[in-house]
C-alpha cells in the first residue's frame, strides 16, 4: 500500500512539474500570452487524436467569446487623453512621452468612436475558427443540416456570430443556420444578464489560494519604470494614481486594434510577461468566483446535446457567442485542463489555469462521436482548438463516454442550488 501511494505521489509530482514547465515555456515562446484576456486568438497547428475505430463525429456543442475588440469601456481612452493632454500642455512629457502623445492624438477619434466594438481582426478570428471547425470535422457538416447560433445582445457578440456563421455557410451552402440574439436565449450565453427572464442568482466563493496570497512574493518595479519613461514628473496630473494601469491596459489591447507600435518602447512584451503570474492569480480569482453563474449554460449544452443523441433534435451544431466573463467561469465549472482544482498554494494556480486560454475569440468545442457497431456515444473537448482534459472518468482520453459526461456534469450542476430558484 505504501509503495502504491509513493508511486501515485511521484506521478502527481511529475504531472505538476510538467504543467509548470509547460505554462512557463509557452509564455517564453510567446510573451504576448501574458496579455491574458487581451491576448488575440492564436490558431494552433496541433494534431488531433484520430477517432476511435468505427466512430465518426456527428454533432458539436460550442461556446465562444467574441473576437478582438477595442477596449471594453471608453474610460481608458478618455483617461489617457486627459492625462497626456495635461502633461503635454505643462511640458511634463519626456521625448518618448511626446512621441506617444502624438500617435495617441492621431488615433484618438477612432478610439473614442470604436470603444467596445469588434475589430476587423475579431471578425477574421471567427471566420478562421469556423473554417477550422469545418475542416477538422467534415463528417458533421458535409451533408448540410441545421445549426442554431445564439449570442448575447451586445454588438461585438452578434457580429462575431455573423462572421462565424457566414464562413460556415460558405464552406457548405447546404448548412441551414438560424441566428438569434434575443432575451429568449440569454440563459444559454449570458445567464445573469438583467434582461434574462430566467435569471437565477448563484452563490459565489473565493479560490482557496486567497487565504495564502501573502505567500506570493513578486517584486514589481515596472510601474515606476514605465512612468519615468513617459513623464518628467507627475505633479498635479489627472489620473496620476492610475498612470501605469492606463498605460499597461492600452499596451495589451493594441494588437487587437491594429495599433501595435503606438507606444514605442514605453513597454515591452517581455516586461508584461515578467508580471504574468501575479496577473494570472487575479484572473483566476475573477473567473473562479462566478463559476456557478454558468450552470445554465452547461445545462443548455447538456439538454440540447441529449436531444440530438436521442434523435429529438436534428441539429448538427449548437453555437453560442458570449463573453470572457462567462467562458472563463465555464472553464472552471467544467474543470477543463484542471481549472477546477482550486489549489491552496498561489504558486500552483498557473498549473491549472492560464489566463491566455480566455483570450479573444476563445472557445470550447464539445465534439460528439457515434459508431454503427457500438452504442456508446463519445465526447471530446477542445479548448481553443486543442484537445483538453476533463474531470470525467475515462480510459480513452481525450474521449469520454457521453453517458459518463452527462451524468457527471448533471450532478455537478445539481450540487449547487440557486439562491432564487
Question: Which sequence ranges carry the predicted segments?
Answer:
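Signature for phosphate-centric chemistry
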Residues: 20-146, 152-318, 322-421
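Bacterial Sec-dependent N-terminal signal peptides
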Residues: 1-23
Amino acid at each position: 500500500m505504501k509503495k502504491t501511494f509513493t508511486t501515485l505521489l511521484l506521478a502527481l509530482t511529475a504531472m505538476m512539474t510538467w504543467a509548470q514547465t509547460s505554462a512557463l515555456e509557452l509564455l517564453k515562446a510567446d510573451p504576448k500570452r501574458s496579455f491574458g484576456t487581451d491576448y488575440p486568438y492564436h490558431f494552433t497547428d496541433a494534431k488531433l487524436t484520430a477517432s476511435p475505430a468505427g466512430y465518426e463525429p456527428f454533432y458539436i456543442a460550442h461556446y465562444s467569446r467574441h473576437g478582438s475588440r477595442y477596449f471594453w469601456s471608453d474610460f481608458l481612452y478618455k483617461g489617457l487623453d486627459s492625462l497626456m493632454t495635461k502633461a503635454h500642455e505643462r511640458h511634463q512629457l519626456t521625448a518618448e512621452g511626446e512621441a506617444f502623445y502624438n500617435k495617441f492624438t492621431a488615433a484618438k477619434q477612432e478610439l473614442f468612436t470604436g470603444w467596445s466594438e469588434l475589430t476587423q481582426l475579431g471578425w477574421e478570428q471567427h471566420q478562421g475558427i469556423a473554417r477550422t471547425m469545418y475542416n477538422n470535422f467534415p463528417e458533421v457538416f458535409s451533408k448540410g443540416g441545421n445549426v442554431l447560433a445564439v449570442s448575447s445582445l451586445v454588438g461585438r457578440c452578434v457580429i462575431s456570430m455573423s462572421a462565424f456563421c457566414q464562413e460556415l455557410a460558405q464552406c457548405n451552402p447546404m448548412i441551414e443556420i438560424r441566428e438569434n440574439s434575443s432575451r429568449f436565449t440569454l440563459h444559454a450565453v449570458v445567464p445573469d444578464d438583467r434582461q434574462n427572464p430566467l435569471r437565477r442568482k448563484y452563490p459565489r466563493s473565493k479560490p482557496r489560494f486567497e487565504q495564502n496570497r501573502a505567500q506570493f512574493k513578486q517584486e514589481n518595479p515596472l510601474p515606476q519604470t514605465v512612468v519615468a519613461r513617459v513623464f518628467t514628473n507627475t505633479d498635479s496630473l489627472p489620473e496620476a494614481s492610475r498612470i501605469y494601469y492606463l498605460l499597461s491596459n492600452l499596451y495589451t489591447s493594441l494588437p487587437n486594434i491594429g495599433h501595435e507600435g503606438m507606444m514605442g518602447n514605453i513597454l515591452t512584451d517581455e516586461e508584461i510577461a515578467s508580471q504574468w503570474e501575479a496577473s494570472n492569480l487575479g484572473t483566476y480569482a475573477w473567473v473562479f468566483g462566478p463559476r456557478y453563474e454558468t450552470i445554465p449554460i452547461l445545462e443548455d449544452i447538456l439538454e440540447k446535446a441529449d436531444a440530438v443523441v436521442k434523435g429529438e433534435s436534428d441539429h448538427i451544431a449548437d453555437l453560442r457567442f458570449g463573453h470572457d466573463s462567462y467562458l472563463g467561469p465555464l472553464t472552471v465549472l467544467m474543470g477543463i485542463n484542471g481549472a477546477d482544482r482550486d489549489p491552496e498554494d498561489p504558486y500552483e494556480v498557473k498549473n491549472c489555469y492560464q489566463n491566455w486560454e480566455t483570450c479573444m475569440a476563445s472557445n470550447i468545442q464539445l465534439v460528439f462521436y457515434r459508431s454503427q457497431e457500438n452504442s456508446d456515444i463519445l465526447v471530446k473537448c477542445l479548448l481553443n482548438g486543442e484537445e483538453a482534459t476533463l474531470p470525467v472518468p475515462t480510459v480513452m482520453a481525450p474521449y469520454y463516454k457521453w453517458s459518463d459526461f452527462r451524468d457527471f456534469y448533471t450532478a455537478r450542476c445539481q450540487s449547487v442550488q440557486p439562491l432564487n430558484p
